[in-house]
Amino acid sequence: MRFKALLRAIFRFRKTNFSILLIITYAIIIALLVFDRSRYKLDLPNATSDKLRRNLLEQAWSDLQVITQSPHPYSSRNNDVVHDFLLQRVKNITRSNDNIYIDDDYRNKSSILFHQPDVFNSTSKVSRVVYYESSNIIVKVVGSNNELPALLISGHFDSVPTSYGATDDGKGIATMLSLLNHFSSSQPKRSVIFNFNNNEEFGLLGAYAFTYHPWIRDIEYFINLEGMGAGDRAVLFRTSNVETAEIYKKAVKSRPFGNSIFQQGFNSRYIGSQTDYKVYDEYGLKGWDISFYKPRDYYHTAKDSIQYTSKESLWSMLNQSLQLAIYISNEKLIKKSSSNPAVFFDLLGLFFVVVDTKHLFYADIFMLIVGPILLMMKAHLDKRRRLERSRLVQLRLLLSLGLSVVFLLLLTKSLNSFNPFVYSADYRTPLTGLFLLFVTVNYLIVTLAERLNPTESYKTVAINQIFIIAWLMQLYITLRMAKSDFTLTGTYPLSIFSGCLIVALSLGLFGTKNKAVNDAPNSSVRYASSQNDEDNPLPSQDRGENINQVRDTGNQEVTSNTNTDLHSNAEEVDERMPLLSNNHIGDSGKMDKNSDFSKHYNWIVQFLCIVPISSFIFLFSLDYTLDAIHKMVQETTDDVQLICIIITIGVILLALPILPFISKLNYQSSVIIAIIGVLLFGKSLVMQPFSEIAPLKVRFLQTVNQHDISKSSVSLFTAKDTPIKEMIYDLPSVKSQSTLVNCTVFGGSKICDYYGLPPNLVDSEGNRQNKNLMKIEVLKNDNNDTQRSPYAPLSAEIKINVSENRVCSLAFWSQSSKQSPVKKFSVIKSNNNNTNSVSNSIKYADGIDEVLIHKLDFNGAHHFSIEWLPNIPFDLDYDPVIDGQGDNNIEITVACFTGEADSLSVVNGHPLKKIPAFDEVVKYSPKWYTFTNRDRGLVVIKDKIQL
């Protein structure tokens, strides 16, 4: 009997029991989170037992070291160095294999001219045409079964001008070389095609170029390898549908890592970047986007280098890609009839879960229907049991939750006022502090209400009301799911939470049969404060229990303390018993001994149904989301608001599972929680938002003044309220020349302009001012032809000469037309016999606003022609002879981009940095700054012409 009494004491709904269980639950969840985030560091293949994979990793690491020796954007000569290295590596790997074919776009002089919407801004209405000369290296490993469609593996070898490209996308390229090495020695059943593509960074152009290659017609599946962070683990960002998600699940048995929350981030455009996955997906291929996703403040900066990454990080991509590629290339894949998007996530890298979004939609509808039915049944049974709960009890959770939300909003607002960029340095500290304070306020309000109006029914009422809140959220999500054609793949945590609540409600209803607890008419039994549980930890068989029995008589409430002996083994009769029970008090006043189960275990079963699973899913999902995007606060203050909204919603969702039980939190635990919450929130208020390991990323662009190169303006872009102006005034060149710094705020961003050190863009002797960097020649202009018919299209032929340049843009503007009058653009190339001919031409009836030109020749001119329509007034009486011709003039703004970090020019025999202004901000700014490019190059040369 002593053992039985001990068990009852352990599992009673007591403050100590609940507090211990809550602490254990969160300790386990946090330990699992730490384990999940750091486990990849322990996963390197063993050099003895797994020699083959270890050799692949070591070779990939060596390749990565070579690729990342210097920045290598498409516009640089180092880009050609990387291209040549890759081509030679591919030849060395495949030299002894007759089933492998290599195609080099550089050698083939492949080029494309096409109309392209803005891939990074889906809301842009700019009509853009792109001319691109490709240097992709394409390799085909012919499979043994020609009937199987091919697999494409793609990655890009260019970097941005400010980055060494270790993660973006050197690891992807090194992984591809290792995969090619594997398939060259082990012929796959399915042909595998590798696209080592160029110029992904500024338009996904290497992938677009591949869509014009004849081999793409053989492909059905693709794996895109990308880096949108600068290290850590590679994640399955997105995949085409349920079929491809299931393939990943079957293929990647060792350390799967993916979450469809990232996929929804792309679909909803919360993630502004894009990858080549977009191109292949729009072409109609089915595939996987495997990418690194953090840290974003190293992304596209000099810290995206070998120094700041690791073999463990490289292996996380190589391991997933190798498993997936081997499985796809050697299996006859079974196609599913469903092409719906998939909800997917891994569990600690041990299991991978895949759910059809339409199936999740049906499950949500089922829960939306079943939930209210359960609540109505519960209300009916409460009525039969004559349980009458006062309105104060009904309002208790709503009051505590409402006041806590107001308090939470005040805290986040104060944090934004005092330290808005703290989330960039550490989002977990403010998140934890806000969560603990939110729980503390709920605890205080509920405890105070318990003292004023004691009740044992709070848990049940709170579960019901939280389910109603979850039901409303689920209804909103389900309606959005239907409108979005089932593309909402990141809302599954709410579905899991609702499912947990329904299970908890069902246990209360269907655990046992229904009997009235008290047959006395118009009576209800209520306990005094729940603190009484602490007073009698081990109830005696010889002792009755003190019951605060309340009877309603008209409008009067009569209370009497009665020492009632229900049974020698019985304890309180209270709301902790299930609603449907075999264990009841009959007319004899006796209770069945089986009531002990419902009395002592009901709350703990409900706790285990709701809290661990929901808290685990909410915490992991929230941490993944914030881990990926918390650095966005550096972009604009609008992103600060977005992060705050996510944290606020996340805190509420994290707290909801424990609120029904919060009244049983003991005093000691509540004090500790409050103290830790205050300390963490206080730390968040004073924490330095930027540091060497969590730097502020600033975007750089220098605009050359051709008339006076010493007046070349430097523009630094960052979020509003960052201390960028003070840093600029501390630069040696600014101080020595007393240069003015002009900062302008637009939206949530800030741009600061000043005259920086002049660039050294080309090798030169004598005057180092680099005059005539750009020369625009108009070779032909019909607008000046007086014999031209006023109704005939106008045309012009133009040549732009820019030394050491590959990339230019043209913007067309006409004062007389809202829409661009330019309808045709043609690229003109020189032939071997010194004659010119049109190599590519495109017409676009809606008008061309902008043309981007990418050529591989550094010193050749940008030579092109355009056609535009004359301005003809919409007047039937219009006569061009009498009234004269309309305004047919157009303005062309030419911008040519050049320059990459660490590059040199020889001026008067001395090697000098090409962009000393950039070198200056890197060298003399505090160590918690890091810099990246604002545009296609670090330097832009601009000019205008009128036609």
Curated annotation (Swiss-Prot):
Glycans are attached at residues 46, 92, 108, 121, 319, 742, 784, 801, 833. Its EC number is 3.4.-.-. GO terms for biological process: proteolysis. It is found in: Vacuole membrane. One of its GO terms (cellular component) is fungal-type vacuole membrane. The chain crosses the membrane at residues 16-36, 359-379, 392-412, 429-449, 459-479, 490-510, 602-622, 642-662, 670-690. It is a multi-pass membrane protein. Coiled coil: none annotated. The keyword Glycoprotein applies. The keyword Nucleotide-binding does not apply. Residues 522-531, 546-567 have a biased composition (Polar residues). Residues 1-15, 380-391, 450-458, 511-601, 663-669 are cytoplasmic. InterPro entries: Fxna-like_M28_dom, M28_fam, Peptidase_M28, PFF1_C, PFF1_TM. It is an enzyme of class 3 (hydrolase). The record marks 299 as: Transition state stabilizer. The active site is at 200 (proton acceptor). Residues 522-573 are annotated as: Disordered. Keywords: Glycoprotein, Hydrolase, Membrane, Metal-binding, Metalloprotease, Protease, Transmembrane, Transmembrane helix, Vacuole, Zinc. Zn(2+) 1 binds at residues 156, 168, 226. Belongs to the peptidase M28 family. This is Vacuolar membrane protease.
